[in-house]
Every structure is written in C-alpha cells, then in structure tokens.
Amino acid sequence: MLYLLSDLSSSFTPLNVFRYITFRTGGALFTAGLFVFWFGPWIISLLRIRQGKGQPIREDGPQTHLLTKRGTPTMGGLMILAGAVVAILLWANPRNHYVWVTLTVTLGFGAIGFYDDYLKVTKQSHKGFSGKFRLALEAVIAMAACVTIAVYSPAALQNQLAFPVFKDALLNLGWFYPLFGAFVIVGAGNSVNMTDGLDGLAIVPVMIACGTFGFIAYLVGNSFTASYLQVNYVRDTGELAVVCGAVIGAGLGFLWFNAPPAQIFMGDTGSLALGGLLGSIAVATKHEIVLAIVGGLFVLEMMSVIIQVASFKLTGKRVFRMAPIHHHFEQKGWKEPQVVIRFWIIAVILAMAGLATLKLR
C-alpha cells in the first residue's frame, strides 16, 4: 500500500522513493522479519497449547528424532505466511496482477497444507487427507493461476516455454502450457514439502531460491537489463522481487525459532505454500526450467521418494535406506547438522548455477 504514496511525489518529492523496487524489497524483508520475530513466541505458545503432543514423529525414522523432536508443535508456516503477507500488502504495488496471483497460490496451497497438518495433529497420524484429493485441489489452484498469468503475459510469450542458455529459444506449448505450468507449481509445492524433514533444512534453501528468483524477476521485469542479458522481457514481473524479499524476511524470522533444536516445525502449511510461491514466480518470469536448477535440491528430494516407491513396487527392493534422501544420509551415520549444512551448500551452488544461465547466451 505504501507504493500508492508515490502518487503524491509531485507534491512531496521524498515520496518518490516508494517507486523503487529495491527500496520496497528491503522494506518488505525488514517488516516480515520483524513481524515473525516479534510475534513468533506468542504463536509458538498458542500452537503448543492447542496441539498438545505436537507433530507425530515417524516410528521408522532415525530413533534420535523420537527423543529430540517429539512434542514440537507444527504449523509454523502460519508464522511465515502471516509475516510475508503483511509485508507484501504493505510494500508491494497493489495494482500488480502478478503479486495477487502469487499470493493466491501461496495462500491456497497454505490452506491445503494447514488442513493436512490439522488432521495429522488431531489424529496423531502421518496420514492427512487423501493424497489424490490434495493434488486435485492444488492442480485447480495452479491451473487458474497459470491461465491468469498467460492472459497478462506479453502476447509473444503466451503459452511459450523458454529455454535457458539458448538465445530466443521458445517452444509454443499452446493450450498445453497451463497444464505444464500447473505441473511446475504443484511439483514445486510438493518437492519443498518433501524437503521439510530436519530442523532448518527446508527454510534456508527456500530463502536461497527466493533470493535468486527475486533477482531474476527484477532483471526480467526491467526492459534495459532484460535486453542486455538477452532474456525475455516480462513487464511488471519486477514487483515479484518485493514478494521474494518478504518471504526471505519471514524465513529469517522463522529460522530463529526453527534452528536446532527447533521450537516449531514449518509443517505442510509452510512447505506447500512456499513451494507453490516459487513455482508461480518461475511461471510468471518464464524461468520454469531454471527453477529445476535453482531448486535442484527440492527436485532431488522428490525424485528420491519417487525412485524409492517405484523400486519397491517393481522389485520389492529399496534403493535408499530411507526416503526422502536426507533420512538416507542420517541412516548412514551423518549427524542432523551435517546433513542440513551440506544440503545448504548444495542449494547455494545450484542457485549460482541457475544465475549463470542468465549470462550464458
């Protein structure tokens, strides 16, 4: 909303600062972080009282988890979403359609995750509601978002899939594009969901990916930088940098409480929402393939589950000691902090590789 103050800059010049995306991105980051840090203890106390036993812990997982994680409340994504939404509404341009599409996906996926968490906590079971029904709901939200994005995208880029590295390489997917875009968004949401299994494991790679895509959105949404880098210019997507800034700020605030030993878990409420957000930004900026690089850690986690399930059904044997793959390394003897920090390092390397594609033309 503060962006609207820039309309008064002709009367009071200092208000012109609210036009700058970089200034508002910093403001969103600071606001979201302060919000989560300030209200975090109250939210954690409330969730602990409401949930009692907290998130159910897998009996077949590392035995240390039964001792160190039992009783920890979940639904910490509420903290992240609350801080991010407040900051976005305060600092982002309310006239920007990409902001509203991204918010819709984020809150829609967050609501699905919240209900799933609610069922798990109340039933003290790892099974939420039907996986197929959950995927169907996510697909409907994602499809609606992709159709809206396509409507507002430049005519030359509608229904086009852009390839990194290759200059002007576009593939017209036609009416199949919304399906592809929905696959990206739903896949991103569930991949981040699979990654969220250890203290701090998911939130830092999410912040790294958000920082990367915030930078990409800023460059793609600026005609000068897009022309210089020879990437597709998508007008108005620069505003998504403010959204990414808000998520990073909220993520930093959440990490304060999620650092080991975690006082709260993100839960499906946060992981589905944040993954959906990343997917929708990738679709809006026409960098869907780059998301697979930047978010390669999330892809690895999801693929480990798919491979494990497929292998067991086809051969009766498991490829990994346990899936997702972060538990495989725990079963091999890695300590939880080792797994988490090494996966963070991988996330940084993949983010740098994703950014490198902007320059390779």
Swiss-Prot record:
PROSITE patterns: MRAY_1, MRAY_2. It is an enzyme of class 2 (transferase). Its cofactor is Mg(2+). The chain crosses the membrane at residues 27-47, 72-92, 99-119, 135-155, 169-189, 200-220, 240-260, 264-284, 289-309, 338-358. Pfam families: Glycos_transf_4 (PF00953), MraY_sig1 (PF10555). It is a multi-pass membrane protein. Belongs to the glycosyltransferase 4 family. MraY subfamily. Catalyzes the initial step of the lipid cycle reactions in the biosynthesis of the cell wall peptidoglycan: transfers peptidoglycan precursor phospho-MurNAc-pentapeptide from UDP-MurNAc-pentapeptide onto the lipid carrier undecaprenyl phosphate, yielding undecaprenyl-pyrophosphoryl-MurNAc-pentapeptide, known as lipid I. It is found in: Cell inner membrane. GO terms for molecular function: metal ion binding; phospho-N-acetylmuramoyl-pentapeptide-transferase activity; UDP-N-acetylmuramoyl-L-alanyl-D-glutamyl-meso-2,6-diaminopimelyl-D-alanyl-D-alanine:undecaprenyl-phosphate transferase activity. Its main location: membrane. Pathway: Cell wall biogenesis; peptidoglycan biosynthesis. NCBIfam families: mraY (TIGR00445). It catalyses: UDP-N-acetyl-alpha-D-muramoyl-L-alanyl-gamma-D-glutamyl-meso-2,6-diaminopimeloyl-D-alanyl-D-alanine + di-trans,octa-cis-undecaprenyl phosphate = di-trans,octa-cis-undecaprenyl diphospho-N-acetyl-alpha-D-muramoyl-L-alanyl-D-glutamyl-meso-2,6-diaminopimeloyl-D-alanyl-D-alanine + UMP. Its EC number is 2.7.8.13. PANTHER family: PHOSPHO-N-ACETYLMURAMOYL-PENTAPEPTIDE-TRANSFERASE (PTHR22926), PHOSPHO-N-ACETYLMURAMOYL-PENTAPEPTIDE-TRANSFERASE HOMOLOG (PTHR22926:SF5). HAMAP family: MraY. Keywords: Cell cycle, Cell division, Cell inner membrane, Cell membrane, Cell shape, Cell wall biogenesis/degradation, Magnesium, Membrane, Metal-binding, Peptidoglycan synthesis, Transferase, Transmembrane, Transmembrane helix. This is Phospho-N-acetylmuramoyl-pentapeptide-transferase. GO terms for biological process: cell division; cell wall organization; peptidoglycan biosynthetic process; regulation of cell shape. GO terms for cellular component: plasma membrane.
